[in-house]
Protein backbone atom coordinates (compact mmCIF):
# COMPACT_ATOMS: atom_id res chain seq x y z
CA UNK A 1 0.00 0.00 0.00
CA UNK A 2 1.38 3.43 -0.93
CA UNK A 3 2.00 6.05 1.77
CA UNK A 4 -0.84 8.18 0.34
CA UNK A 5 -3.29 5.26 0.36
CA UNK A 6 -2.24 4.34 3.90
CA UNK A 7 -2.86 7.89 5.04
CA UNK A 8 -6.30 7.82 3.39
CA UNK A 9 -7.14 4.53 5.12
CA UNK A 10 -6.07 5.99 8.48
CA UNK A 11 -8.29 9.01 7.91
CA UNK A 12 -11.28 6.75 7.21
CA UNK A 13 -10.62 4.80 10.42
CA UNK A 14 -10.31 8.05 12.39
CA UNK A 15 -13.56 9.34 10.91
CA UNK A 16 -15.38 6.10 11.71
CA UNK A 17 -14.13 6.18 15.29
CA UNK A 18 -15.10 9.83 15.65
CA UNK A 19 -18.59 9.21 14.31
CA UNK A 20 -19.01 6.15 16.55
CA UNK A 21 -18.20 8.25 19.61
CA UNK A 22 -20.61 10.98 18.53
CA UNK A 23 -23.42 8.50 17.89
CA UNK A 24 -22.93 7.10 21.37
CA UNK A 25 -23.35 10.60 22.77
CA UNK A 26 -26.52 11.07 20.71
CA UNK A 27 -27.85 7.75 22.03
CA UNK A 28 -27.34 9.03 25.56
CA UNK A 29 -29.26 12.19 24.68
CA UNK A 30 -32.12 10.12 23.29
CA UNK A 31 -32.33 8.27 26.58
CA UNK A 32 -32.76 11.63 28.32
CA UNK A 33 -35.77 12.26 26.09
CA UNK A 34 -34.95 15.46 24.15
CA UNK A 35 -32.11 14.88 21.68
CA UNK A 36 -33.12 17.72 19.33
CA UNK A 37 -34.94 20.43 21.34
CA UNK A 38 -36.82 23.15 19.48
CA UNK A 39 -37.83 25.54 22.24
CA UNK A 40 -34.77 27.82 22.35
CA UNK A 41 -35.18 31.34 20.94
CA UNK A 42 -32.38 33.79 20.26
CA UNK A 43 -32.82 37.56 20.23
CA UNK A 44 -29.62 38.68 18.45
CA UNK A 45 -27.18 37.51 15.81
CA UNK A 46 -23.44 37.96 16.15
CA UNK A 47 -23.20 40.76 13.59
CA UNK A 48 -25.97 42.68 15.34
CA UNK A 49 -24.09 42.40 18.63
CA UNK A 50 -20.80 43.53 17.12
CA UNK A 51 -22.43 46.44 15.29
CA UNK A 52 -24.18 47.68 18.42
CA UNK A 53 -21.60 47.03 21.14
CA UNK A 54 -18.06 46.71 19.71
CA UNK A 55 -17.43 50.42 20.15
CA UNK A 56 -18.45 50.47 23.82
CA UNK A 57 -15.88 50.36 26.60
CA UNK A 58 -15.79 47.49 29.09
CA UNK A 59 -17.00 49.70 31.95
CA UNK A 60 -19.92 50.97 29.89
CA UNK A 61 -20.98 47.42 28.98
CA UNK A 62 -20.80 46.36 32.61
CA UNK A 63 -22.99 49.29 33.63
CA UNK A 64 -25.54 48.52 30.91
CA UNK A 65 -25.90 44.94 32.23
CA UNK A 66 -27.23 43.64 28.89
CA UNK A 67 -28.44 40.04 28.70
CA UNK A 68 -28.65 38.43 25.26
CA UNK A 69 -29.63 35.11 23.73
CA UNK A 70 -27.62 33.66 20.82
CA UNK A 71 -27.42 30.37 18.93
CA UNK A 72 -25.03 28.86 16.43
CA UNK A 73 -22.38 26.26 15.69
CA UNK A 74 -19.47 25.66 18.07
CA UNK A 75 -16.36 26.22 15.94
CA UNK A 76 -13.63 26.30 18.60
CA UNK A 77 -13.37 25.55 22.30
CA UNK A 78 -10.58 26.17 24.80
CA UNK A 79 -11.15 24.32 28.08
CA UNK A 80 -9.09 25.72 30.97
CA UNK A 81 -10.20 23.77 34.00
CA UNK A 82 -13.29 25.35 35.50
CA UNK A 83 -13.76 27.84 32.64
CA UNK A 84 -13.74 27.72 28.84
CA UNK A 85 -13.94 29.99 25.82
CA UNK A 86 -16.12 29.00 22.85
CA UNK A 87 -16.37 30.53 19.40
CA UNK A 88 -19.98 30.40 18.22
CA UNK A 89 -20.72 30.91 14.51
CA UNK A 90 -24.09 32.01 13.13
CA UNK A 91 -25.34 33.61 9.92
CA UNK A 92 -23.85 36.97 10.88
CA UNK A 93 -20.37 35.83 11.86
CA UNK A 94 -18.82 34.80 15.17
CA UNK A 95 -19.15 35.71 18.84
CA UNK A 96 -17.12 34.48 21.81
CA UNK A 97 -18.74 32.75 24.78
CA UNK A 98 -17.21 32.62 28.25
CA UNK A 99 -18.38 29.45 29.99
CA UNK A 100 -17.64 29.06 33.72
CA UNK A 101 -18.56 25.94 35.67
CA UNK A 102 -19.90 27.82 38.68
CA UNK A 103 -22.17 30.08 36.59
CA UNK A 104 -24.15 27.19 35.08
CA UNK A 105 -26.65 24.84 36.73
CA UNK A 106 -24.98 21.97 38.57
CA UNK A 107 -23.61 19.27 36.28
CA UNK A 108 -24.00 21.20 33.02
CA UNK A 109 -20.31 22.09 32.68
CA UNK A 110 -18.70 18.73 33.43
CA UNK A 111 -21.42 16.28 32.49
CA UNK A 112 -22.70 18.04 29.37
CA UNK A 113 -20.65 20.91 27.97
CA UNK A 114 -17.25 19.21 28.19
CA UNK A 115 -18.67 16.19 26.32
CA UNK A 116 -20.03 18.20 23.42
CA UNK A 117 -18.09 18.31 20.14
CA UNK A 118 -16.99 20.94 17.66
CA UNK A 119 -19.72 21.35 15.08
CA UNK A 120 -22.52 20.92 17.63
CA UNK A 121 -25.19 23.63 17.55
CA UNK A 122 -25.66 25.44 20.85
CA UNK A 123 -27.96 27.99 22.41
CA UNK A 124 -26.50 30.41 24.96
CA UNK A 125 -27.82 33.13 27.25
CA UNK A 126 -25.76 35.55 29.27
CA UNK A 127 -24.48 39.07 29.81
CA UNK A 128 -22.27 41.00 27.43
CA UNK A 129 -18.79 41.95 28.57
CA UNK A 130 -15.35 42.60 27.15
CA UNK A 131 -12.28 40.50 27.87
CA UNK A 132 -8.94 41.99 28.90
CA UNK A 133 -7.98 42.00 25.21
CA UNK A 134 -11.12 43.98 24.35
CA UNK A 135 -13.06 41.19 22.64
CA UNK A 136 -16.84 41.38 22.90
CA UNK A 137 -18.04 38.21 24.64
CA UNK A 138 -21.03 36.66 26.40
CA UNK A 139 -20.70 35.47 30.00
CA UNK A 140 -22.99 32.45 29.86
CA UNK A 141 -25.62 31.76 32.50
CA UNK A 142 -27.41 29.17 30.36
CA UNK A 143 -25.99 26.81 27.73
CA UNK A 144 -27.91 24.14 25.82
CA UNK A 145 -27.15 21.61 23.12
CA UNK A 146 -29.67 22.12 20.30
CA UNK A 147 -28.34 19.78 17.60
CA UNK A 148 -25.76 17.02 17.90
CA UNK A 149 -23.37 16.90 14.91
CA UNK A 150 -22.52 13.31 14.01
CA UNK A 151 -19.71 14.20 11.62
CA UNK A 152 -16.68 16.34 12.48
CA UNK A 153 -15.95 19.66 10.83
CA UNK A 154 -13.15 20.03 8.27
CA UNK A 155 -9.74 20.52 9.85
CA UNK A 156 -9.91 23.87 11.62
CA UNK A 157 -6.46 24.94 10.45
CA UNK A 158 -6.76 24.01 6.79
CA UNK A 159 -10.50 24.17 6.17
CA UNK A 160 -12.03 22.42 3.17
CA UNK A 161 -9.11 22.33 0.73
CA UNK A 162 -10.51 19.90 -1.87
CA UNK A 163 -12.15 22.05 -4.57
CA UNK A 164 -14.41 19.22 -5.70
CA UNK A 165 -15.60 18.70 -2.13
CA UNK A 166 -16.29 22.43 -1.79
CA UNK A 167 -18.78 22.25 -4.66
CA UNK A 168 -20.28 18.84 -3.88
CA UNK A 169 -20.67 19.55 -0.17
CA UNK A 170 -21.36 23.26 -0.27
CA UNK A 171 -22.72 23.12 3.27
CA UNK A 172 -19.24 22.26 4.56
CA UNK A 173 -17.73 25.00 2.43
CA UNK A 174 -20.14 27.54 3.90
CA UNK A 175 -19.45 26.36 7.45
CA UNK A 176 -15.69 26.59 7.13
CA UNK A 177 -15.06 29.30 4.54
CA UNK A 178 -15.81 32.95 5.32
CA UNK A 179 -15.01 33.94 1.73
CA UNK A 180 -17.65 31.60 0.32
CA UNK A 181 -20.28 32.86 2.73
CA UNK A 182 -19.48 36.45 1.80
CA UNK A 183 -19.65 35.63 -1.92
CA UNK A 184 -23.20 34.35 -1.65
CA UNK A 185 -24.25 37.19 0.62
CA UNK A 186 -22.97 39.57 -2.05
CA UNK A 187 -24.86 37.63 -4.72
CA UNK A 188 -28.07 38.09 -2.76
CA UNK A 189 -27.40 41.82 -2.42
CA UNK A 190 -26.76 42.10 -6.17
CA UNK A 191 -30.08 40.42 -6.99
CA UNK A 192 -31.91 42.66 -4.53
CA UNK A 193 -30.14 45.69 -6.01
CA UNK A 194 -31.14 44.75 -9.55
CA UNK A 195 -34.77 44.39 -8.54
CA UNK A 196 -34.73 47.72 -6.74
CA UNK A 197 -33.09 49.41 -9.76
CA UNK A 198 -35.60 47.96 -12.21
CA UNK A 199 -38.75 48.62 -10.18
CA UNK A 200 -37.62 52.22 -9.60
CA UNK A 201 -37.62 52.67 -13.39
CA UNK A 202 -41.12 51.36 -13.90
CA UNK A 203 -40.35 47.75 -14.81
CA UNK A 204 -42.61 44.90 -13.72
CA UNK A 205 -41.09 41.57 -12.70
CA UNK A 206 -42.74 38.59 -14.41
CA UNK A 207 -42.29 34.83 -14.77
CA UNK A 208 -42.41 32.93 -18.04
CA UNK A 209 -42.38 29.17 -18.81
CA UNK A 210 -39.34 27.10 -17.91
CA UNK A 211 -40.58 24.21 -20.08
CA UNK A 212 -41.32 25.13 -23.67
CA UNK A 213 -42.64 23.31 -26.71
CA UNK A 214 -40.34 25.39 -28.90
CA UNK A 215 -37.06 26.61 -27.35
CA UNK A 216 -36.23 30.08 -28.54
CA UNK A 217 -34.60 33.38 -27.72
CA UNK A 218 -30.99 32.25 -28.17
CA UNK A 219 -28.75 30.08 -30.28
CA UNK A 220 -27.99 27.06 -28.09
CA UNK A 221 -28.56 23.32 -27.76
CA UNK A 222 -31.52 22.67 -25.41
CA UNK A 223 -32.20 19.97 -22.84
CA UNK A 224 -35.13 17.73 -23.75
CA UNK A 225 -37.68 16.37 -21.28
CA UNK A 226 -41.01 14.58 -21.64
CA UNK A 227 -44.41 15.66 -20.32
CA UNK A 228 -46.19 12.41 -19.43
CA UNK A 229 -49.73 13.81 -19.15
CA UNK A 230 -49.50 15.46 -22.57
CA UNK A 231 -47.27 12.72 -24.03
CA UNK A 232 -45.17 15.52 -25.43
CA UNK A 233 -41.45 16.20 -25.68
CA UNK A 234 -40.64 19.60 -24.22
CA UNK A 235 -37.50 21.67 -23.79
CA UNK A 236 -36.02 23.38 -20.78
CA UNK A 237 -35.82 26.97 -21.82
CA UNK A 238 -32.63 28.42 -23.22
CA UNK A 239 -33.96 31.98 -22.83
CA UNK A 240 -37.23 33.73 -21.87
CA UNK A 241 -36.97 36.31 -24.66
CA UNK A 242 -39.84 35.38 -26.95
CA UNK A 243 -42.32 35.07 -24.07
CA UNK A 244 -41.27 38.40 -22.60
CA UNK A 245 -41.78 40.11 -25.96
CA UNK A 246 -45.22 38.53 -26.21
CA UNK A 247 -45.98 40.40 -22.97
CA UNK A 248 -44.90 43.67 -24.57
CA UNK A 249 -47.27 42.92 -27.46
CA UNK A 250 -49.94 42.40 -24.79
CA UNK A 251 -49.35 45.86 -23.34
CA UNK A 252 -46.85 45.36 -20.50
CA UNK A 253 -44.38 47.94 -21.80
CA UNK A 254 -41.55 47.41 -19.30
CA UNK A 255 -40.93 43.87 -18.05
CA UNK A 256 -38.01 41.96 -16.59
CA UNK A 257 -37.33 38.44 -15.35
CA UNK A 258 -34.55 36.99 -13.21
CA UNK A 259 -34.53 33.23 -13.55
CA UNK A 260 -32.78 30.09 -14.69
CA UNK A 261 -31.86 29.20 -18.26
CA UNK A 262 -30.63 25.77 -19.37
CA UNK A 263 -28.21 25.09 -22.22
CA UNK A 264 -26.96 21.62 -23.04
CA UNK A 265 -23.38 22.69 -23.55
CA UNK A 266 -19.96 22.21 -22.01
CA UNK A 267 -18.89 23.03 -18.48
CA UNK A 268 -15.99 25.42 -17.92
CA UNK A 269 -14.83 28.19 -15.59
CA UNK A 270 -17.30 30.46 -17.41
CA UNK A 271 -20.14 28.07 -18.25
CA UNK A 272 -22.62 26.08 -16.19
CA UNK A 273 -25.47 24.31 -18.03
CA UNK A 274 -27.95 25.80 -15.55
CA UNK A 275 -27.40 29.52 -15.05
CA UNK A 276 -29.21 32.69 -14.01
CA UNK A 277 -30.09 35.51 -16.39
CA UNK A 278 -31.83 38.83 -16.07
CA UNK A 279 -33.73 39.85 -19.20
CA UNK A 280 -35.65 43.08 -19.66
CA UNK A 281 -37.76 44.58 -22.43
CA UNK A 282 -38.59 48.25 -22.76
CA UNK A 283 -41.12 49.61 -25.25
CA UNK A 284 -40.48 52.88 -27.07
CA UNK A 285 -36.74 52.58 -26.59
CA UNK A 286 -33.76 51.52 -28.70
CA UNK A 287 -30.43 49.85 -28.02
CA UNK A 288 -28.78 53.18 -27.20
CA UNK A 289 -31.21 53.66 -24.32
CA UNK A 290 -30.21 50.25 -22.98
CA UNK A 291 -26.51 51.08 -23.26
CA UNK A 292 -27.19 53.99 -20.90
CA UNK A 293 -29.32 51.80 -18.62
CA UNK A 294 -26.66 49.06 -18.48
CA UNK A 295 -23.93 51.54 -17.60
CA UNK A 296 -26.10 53.05 -14.88
CA UNK A 297 -27.04 49.61 -13.50
CA UNK A 298 -23.44 48.44 -13.09
CA UNK A 299 -22.30 51.76 -11.64
CA UNK A 300 -25.20 51.76 -9.18
CA UNK A 301 -24.61 48.15 -8.09
CA UNK A 302 -20.89 48.70 -7.59
CA UNK A 303 -21.55 51.72 -5.40
CA UNK A 304 -24.51 50.31 -3.46
CA UNK A 305 -23.27 46.73 -2.96
CA UNK A 306 -19.51 47.24 -2.67
CA UNK A 307 -19.40 50.90 -1.68
CA UNK A 308 -16.97 51.77 -4.47
CA UNK A 309 -17.03 52.11 -8.27
CA UNK A 310 -13.44 50.81 -8.38
CA UNK A 311 -13.83 47.02 -8.33
CA UNK A 312 -10.70 44.82 -7.96
CA UNK A 313 -10.54 41.63 -10.00
CA UNK A 314 -7.33 39.62 -9.99
CA UNK A 315 -4.58 41.97 -11.13
CA UNK A 316 -7.09 44.42 -12.63
CA UNK A 317 -9.31 47.13 -11.20
CA UNK A 318 -12.53 47.67 -13.13
CA UNK A 319 -13.56 51.32 -13.20
CA UNK A 320 -17.34 51.68 -13.25
CA UNK A 321 -17.12 55.36 -12.37
CA UNK A 322 -15.96 56.68 -15.74
CA UNK A 323 -17.85 56.44 -19.07
CA UNK A 324 -17.62 52.95 -20.57
CA UNK A 325 -15.75 52.49 -23.85
CA UNK A 326 -17.81 52.02 -27.03
CA UNK A 327 -16.45 50.35 -30.18
CA UNK A 328 -18.02 48.83 -33.26
CA UNK A 329 -17.12 45.20 -33.92
CA UNK A 330 -14.91 46.19 -36.84
CA UNK A 331 -13.20 48.95 -34.85
CA UNK A 332 -12.37 46.40 -32.17
CA UNK A 333 -10.89 44.01 -34.75
CA UNK A 334 -8.74 46.82 -36.14
CA UNK A 335 -7.67 47.97 -32.67
CA UNK A 336 -6.46 44.54 -31.59
CA UNK A 337 -5.28 43.33 -35.01
CA UNK A 338 -3.88 46.53 -36.53
CA UNK A 339 -2.72 44.84 -39.74
CA UNK A 340 -6.33 44.12 -40.71
CA UNK A 341 -7.47 45.87 -43.90
CA UNK A 342 -11.03 46.96 -43.10
CA UNK A 343 -12.03 46.40 -46.73
CA UNK A 344 -11.22 42.70 -46.29
CA UNK A 345 -14.03 42.45 -43.74
CA UNK A 346 -16.52 43.36 -46.48
CA UNK A 347 -15.48 40.49 -48.74
CA UNK A 348 -16.32 36.84 -48.04
CA UNK A 349 -13.14 35.31 -49.46
CA UNK A 350 -10.84 37.89 -47.85
CA UNK A 351 -12.54 37.56 -44.46
CA UNK A 352 -12.38 33.78 -44.73
CA UNK A 353 -8.66 33.99 -45.44
CA UNK A 354 -8.11 36.15 -42.35
CA UNK A 355 -10.12 33.74 -40.22
CA UNK A 356 -8.19 30.70 -41.41
CA UNK A 357 -4.87 32.53 -40.93
CA UNK A 358 -5.61 32.91 -37.21
CA UNK A 359 -6.71 29.31 -36.73
CA UNK A 360 -10.49 29.55 -37.19
CA UNK A 361 -12.13 26.61 -38.96
CA UNK A 362 -14.76 28.15 -41.26
CA UNK A 363 -17.88 26.02 -41.55
CA UNK A 364 -19.63 25.71 -44.92
CA UNK A 365 -22.83 27.19 -43.49
CA UNK A 366 -21.15 30.42 -42.37
CA UNK A 367 -21.75 33.65 -44.20
CA UNK A 368 -19.63 36.79 -44.07
CA UNK A 369 -21.31 38.05 -40.90
CA UNK A 370 -20.55 34.89 -38.94
CA UNK A 371 -16.94 34.90 -40.12
CA UNK A 372 -16.40 38.52 -39.04
CA UNK A 373 -17.94 37.73 -35.65
CA UNK A 374 -15.61 34.76 -35.20
CA UNK A 375 -12.62 36.95 -36.07
CA UNK A 376 -13.74 39.44 -33.43
CA UNK A 377 -14.10 36.68 -30.85
CA UNK A 378 -10.61 35.43 -31.60
CA UNK A 379 -8.63 38.68 -31.78
CA UNK A 380 -10.49 41.20 -29.62
CA UNK A 381 -12.69 39.69 -26.91
CA UNK A 382 -9.92 38.74 -24.48
CA UNK A 383 -8.58 42.31 -24.57
CA UNK A 384 -11.83 43.97 -23.50
CA UNK A 385 -10.84 44.29 -19.85
CA UNK A 386 -12.43 47.58 -18.81
CA UNK A 387 -16.23 47.91 -19.30
CA UNK A 388 -16.78 48.07 -23.06
CA UNK A 389 -19.79 48.08 -25.38
CA UNK A 390 -19.33 46.45 -28.81
CA UNK A 391 -21.92 47.48 -31.43
CA UNK A 392 -22.86 46.78 -35.07
CA UNK A 393 -23.26 43.01 -34.91
CA UNK A 394 -23.97 41.33 -38.26
CA UNK A 395 -27.59 40.40 -38.97
CA UNK A 396 -26.49 36.82 -39.66
CA UNK A 397 -25.63 36.26 -35.99
CA UNK A 398 -28.50 38.39 -34.65
CA UNK A 399 -31.71 36.68 -35.80
CA UNK A 400 -33.94 38.57 -33.34
CA UNK A 401 -32.40 42.04 -33.61
CA UNK A 402 -33.63 44.98 -35.68
CA UNK A 403 -31.66 45.76 -38.84
CA UNK A 404 -29.81 49.05 -38.95
CA UNK A 405 -31.60 51.72 -40.99
CA UNK A 406 -28.44 52.72 -42.88
CA UNK A 407 -26.80 49.31 -43.33
CA UNK A 408 -29.21 46.34 -43.32
CA UNK A 409 -26.29 43.88 -43.06
CA UNK A 410 -25.77 44.91 -39.44
CA UNK A 411 -28.17 45.26 -36.52
CA UNK A 412 -28.84 47.78 -33.77
CA UNK A 413 -27.22 45.51 -31.21
CA UNK A 414 -24.53 45.63 -28.57
CA UNK A 415 -22.72 43.22 -26.33
CA UNK A 416 -21.20 44.32 -23.03
CA UNK A 417 -17.75 43.05 -22.02
CA UNK A 418 -15.75 43.21 -18.81
CA UNK A 419 -12.62 41.29 -17.95
CA UNK A 420 -12.40 39.80 -21.43
CA UNK A 421 -15.79 38.11 -21.31
CA UNK A 422 -19.31 38.90 -22.44
CA UNK A 423 -21.58 39.96 -19.58
CA UNK A 424 -24.62 41.31 -21.41
CA UNK A 425 -26.34 41.38 -24.80
CA UNK A 426 -28.90 43.93 -25.93
CA UNK A 427 -30.54 45.23 -29.06
CA UNK A 428 -33.39 47.06 -30.65
CA UNK A 429 -35.93 44.33 -31.18
CA UNK A 430 -37.00 43.12 -34.59
CA UNK A 431 -40.71 43.97 -34.83
CA UNK A 432 -41.17 43.35 -38.56
CA UNK A 433 -43.15 40.08 -38.61
CA UNK A 434 -42.24 39.24 -42.21
CA UNK A 435 -38.52 39.85 -41.64
CA UNK A 436 -38.70 37.73 -38.48
CA UNK A 437 -40.40 34.89 -40.36
CA UNK A 438 -37.62 34.93 -42.96
CA UNK A 439 -34.90 34.93 -40.31
CA UNK A 440 -36.53 32.00 -38.56
CA UNK A 441 -36.53 30.18 -41.90
CA UNK A 442 -32.83 30.99 -42.32
CA UNK A 443 -32.22 29.44 -38.90
CA UNK A 444 -34.20 26.34 -39.89
CA UNK A 445 -32.01 26.03 -42.98
CA UNK A 446 -28.87 26.39 -40.86
CA UNK A 447 -30.11 23.67 -38.49
CA UNK A 448 -30.75 21.40 -41.47
CA UNK A 449 -27.19 22.07 -42.60
CA UNK A 450 -25.83 20.80 -39.28
CA UNK A 451 -25.93 23.78 -36.91
CA UNK A 452 -27.27 22.23 -33.68
CA UNK A 453 -27.52 25.65 -32.02
CA UNK A 454 -29.64 27.29 -34.72
CA UNK A 455 -33.10 28.43 -33.63
CA UNK A 456 -36.41 26.68 -34.20
CA UNK A 457 -39.22 28.31 -36.17
CA UNK A 458 -41.71 29.77 -33.65
CA UNK A 459 -44.94 30.31 -35.57
CA UNK A 460 -46.88 31.63 -32.58
CA UNK A 461 -44.24 34.28 -31.95
CA UNK A 462 -44.55 35.44 -35.56
CA UNK A 463 -48.32 35.56 -35.03
CA UNK A 464 -47.75 37.76 -31.96
CA UNK A 465 -45.59 40.12 -34.03
CA UNK A 466 -48.35 40.30 -36.64
CA UNK A 467 -50.52 41.88 -33.93
CA UNK A 468 -47.89 44.59 -33.53
CA UNK A 469 -44.86 44.86 -31.25
CA UNK A 470 -44.12 48.49 -30.37
CA UNK A 471 -40.59 49.75 -31.01
CA UNK A 472 -38.79 47.88 -28.23
CA UNK A 473 -35.30 47.27 -26.89
CA UNK A 474 -34.22 44.21 -24.92
CA UNK A 475 -31.27 43.29 -22.73
CA UNK A 476 -29.95 40.09 -21.16
CA UNK A 477 -27.29 40.02 -18.43
CA UNK A 478 -25.61 36.91 -17.05
CA UNK A 479 -26.05 37.14 -13.29
CA UNK A 480 -23.44 34.49 -12.49
CA UNK A 481 -20.75 36.29 -14.48
CA UNK A 482 -21.79 39.60 -12.94
CA UNK A 483 -21.38 38.09 -9.46
CA UNK A 484 -17.96 36.73 -10.46
CA UNK A 485 -16.84 40.27 -11.28
CA UNK A 486 -18.16 41.82 -8.09
CA UNK A 487 -16.73 39.09 -5.82
CA UNK A 488 -13.35 38.62 -7.52
CA UNK A 489 -14.24 35.01 -8.32
CA UNK A 490 -12.48 33.31 -11.22
CA UNK A 491 -14.67 30.28 -11.81
CA UNK A 492 -18.43 30.24 -12.17
CA UNK A 493 -18.64 27.34 -9.71
CA UNK A 494 -17.59 29.69 -6.92
CA UNK A 495 -20.72 31.84 -7.39
CA UNK A 496 -23.32 29.08 -7.92
CA UNK A 497 -24.35 27.38 -4.69
CA UNK A 498 -24.75 23.93 -6.25
CA UNK A 499 -22.99 23.82 -9.65
CA UNK A 500 -23.36 20.93 -12.09
CA UNK A 501 -21.00 18.09 -11.18
CA UNK A 502 -20.36 14.62 -12.52
CA UNK A 503 -21.75 12.08 -10.01
CA UNK A 504 -19.25 10.36 -7.76
CA UNK A 505 -18.94 6.70 -8.76
From Swiss-Prot:
Binding sites annotated in the UniProt record for Mg(2+) 2: 422
Cellular localisation: Cytoplasm
Enzyme class: ligase
UniProt catalytic activity: tRNA(Lys) + L-lysine + ATP = L-lysyl-tRNA(Lys) + AMP + diphosphate
Enzyme Commission numbers on file: 6.1.1.6
GO function terms (MF aspect): ATP binding; lysine-tRNA ligase activity; magnesium ion binding; tRNA binding
PROSITE patterns: AA_TRNA_LIGASE_II
Key word Signal present: no
Protein name per the record: Lysine--tRNA ligase
Organism whose genome encodes this protein: Salmonella arizonae (strain ATCC BAA-731 / CDC346-86 / RSK2980)
Protein encoded by which gene: lysS
